[in-house]
Design a protein with these regions (language model features):
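Serine-esterase "nucleophile elbow" of acetyl-processing enzymes
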Residues: 1-58, 73-80
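Alpha-helical cap/lid subdomain in secreted, periplasmic
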Residues: 2-4, 42-54, 63, 67-214
Length: 214
């Protein structure tokens, strides 16, 4: 991916992206949060200092894809981003498996494609970076294993969407699993099976940079 002048990079998703970011503030110490978008923003801001980039985060903790889509006008299109990085899906799988009230995989795909179509209709030059949703079964329960398998299926949907829209796809699950295996402890990567540790966020950011070649 080429990093152009005056890029506006928007990070979107759930709590993994949110990182306890500030709300309604332009305070540069807080508005990005403390998750992988902060690591990426810090790196890219310095590397491309002469290109005057801007970085925004609108991830909201607890959101599934439908909830993100419901606010997409305000938190997506109206911001006029030139690059949009999306990581979403763990709450869709969690609600579907745990409470049987989340989006089905078919609905997930439909909403995702609709969101991209509507964005490109108004911002045709916007580029997407679609990150693979991930999960780890840290408690050994059947429910967690079902959620893990559901996430794997949704990841394949995201990968196919990225291919269809000629977008960048960032694979993460196998990479995170490999680090967990190396350390012999899944919680050192995703402390509760969902949320990355400092190490986990660093792994995600490094992979994002590797795949985008930025």
């Amino acid at each position: 991916m080429q990093f152009k002048n005056n890029e506006i990079l928007l990070f979107q998703g759930d709590s993994i992206t949110d990182g306890n970011r500030g709300r309604g503030t332009t305070d540069p110490n807080h508005y990005i949060g403390h998750s992988f978008p902060y690591i990426l923003s810090a790196h890219l801001a310095l590397k491309y200092i002469d290109k005057n980039p801007s970085f925004l985060s609108r991830g909201i903790s607890g959101n599934d894809l439908l909830q993100m889509y419901a606010r997409w006008r305000e938190d997506g299109i109206n911001l006029k981003p030139t690059v949009i990085s999306i990581l979403i899906g763990t709450n869709d799988a969690g609600a579907y498996i745990n409470a049987n009230n989340g989006s089905t995989q078919k609905q997930y795909e439909h909403i995702f494609r609709t969101l991209i179509d509507e964005t490109l209709n108004e911002l045709p030059d916007t580029r997407f970076v679609l990150c693979e949703p991930f999960y780890m079964n840290v408690d050994g329960t059947d429910t967690s294993e079902r959620r893990y398998n559901d996430i794997k299926s949704r990841a394949q949907i995201v990968k196919k969407i990225a291919e269809d829209y000629n977008s960048t796809y960032v694979p993460l699950q196998d990479l995170l699993d490999s680090y967990a295996k190396k350390l012999g402890n899944k919680r050192k990567i995703l402390w509760d099976g969902v949320h990355p540790t400092i190490l986990g966020h660093s792994i995600i950011a490094e992979q994002w940079l590797k795949i985008t070649e930025l």
